[in-house]
Amino acid sequence: MSAGSAETVSTLKILGAGPVKRGVSRLAAGFEKQSGHRVTVEFAGAPGVSERVLADEAVDVAIVPQAAMDEFEKRGKVVAGTRGLMGRSRMGIAVRKGASRADIPDTEAFKQAMLDAGAIVCNVASSGVYIVKLLDQLGIADATRDRILRLPDTVKVMEHVAGSPAHAIGVGQLAEISELVEKGLGIALVAPLPDAIQNVTAYHAAVTVASRQQDAARALARFLAAPEAKAVFAATGID
């Protein structure tokens, strides 16, 4: 996994969204060692990241879900030929630590868990959009509408679940839930979404047209998408 080289040392900025943060942070540290460049990593909710990239903020590499990257390409906000797949993330369900955990092996069990939940907490980004649509597809949108709470990102979602009554359910990206559990947040992972209704989100990186150090940014984007990077992402729950 070669980072490339440059005569001038640059400070590169990665602005990203989603559960690839841990893997990206580890890879950024590796890129710094190999290239001599400095890399700052900032992650936020996908809608906010999209707004900033579309507004031509001075970002070198943007990392967002596939649909957002498609929009960046359509609007000419990323450099052609620099887009690369970081990995794919799946969704899961969490409750407050110590709360009872329902067995959710299939779609019917998921549907019942949603009907039984005192609150269904999800983000305002793609994960939350998917859950709201899924509840409608399952025919329980009306029954659950008043109990759905949308928050800016998965961290806020799971912090709310940790401080909520035991019957609240949080839904988000598995990798992010697992990271928060490891950090000691008072939540417990119940299960991934059942296979029949699982939602897989692909995360892509690309150099933005606003980057002021295109050569170094291209080297960083290649480093993040290199075959050797897959093992780093896999270790954080991204495949």
Question: Whereabouts are the PLM-identified features?
Answer:
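Exported/periplasmic ABC-transporter solute-binding proteins
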Residues: 1-42, 47-60, 66-89, 95-239
